[in-house]
């Protein structure tokens, strides 16, 4: 989601994700004459090793990121990829934003 909206202390990360978003849009235009569809998936909070790396291996701090709500997992994203690649040839999914039900924006969560 960082490529769709900026957030505090995410300057470089959000900027690079926004660059990927525009690269994807440009590739979509460049590859259109060849019949190649280009899709982008923008996931919200997904429980991956990202938080562990972000907190330099501190597993307690990394786990705290996901406390109080159910984050996305790899299967959720894989299901989205499967949905995109199984569309009929006349259908192109350009952008798919996937968020946990408890997440309304990059920084707004409903936690238990």
Residues of each region from the PLM?
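Active-site loop immediately N-terminal to the catalytic Tyr-X3-Lys motif
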Residues: 5-11
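Conserved SDR Rossmann-fold cofactor-binding beta-strand/turn motif
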Residues: 37-47
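C-terminal helical subdomain
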Residues: 40-41, 60-106
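Short, flexible, mixed-charge acidic loops at enzyme active sites
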Residues: 51-60, 110-112
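Alpha-helical segment proximal to the catalytic Tyr-Lys
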Residues: 29-33
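Active-site helix of classical SDR
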Residues: 16
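Active-site segment of SDR-like NAD(P)-dependent oxidoreductases
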Residues: 1-5, 45
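Catalytic tyrosine of NAD(P)H-dependent dehydrogenase/reductases that use a Tyr as the general acid/base
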Residues: 13, 21
């Amino acid at each position: 989601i960082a490529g769709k909206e900026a957030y505090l202390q995410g300057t470089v990360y959000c900027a690079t994700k926004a660059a990927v978003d525009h690269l994807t849009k440009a590739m979509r235009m460049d590859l259109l004459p060849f019949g190649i569809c280009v899709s982008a998936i923008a996931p919200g909070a997904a429980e991956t090793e990202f938080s562990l790396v972000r907190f330099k291996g501190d597993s307690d701090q990394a786990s705290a990121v996901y406390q109080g709500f159910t984050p996305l997992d790899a299967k959720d994203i894989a299901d989205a990829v499967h949905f995109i690649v199984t569309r009929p040839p006349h259908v192109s999914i350009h952008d798919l934003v996937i968020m946990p039900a408890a997440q309304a924006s990059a920084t707004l969560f409903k936690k238990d």
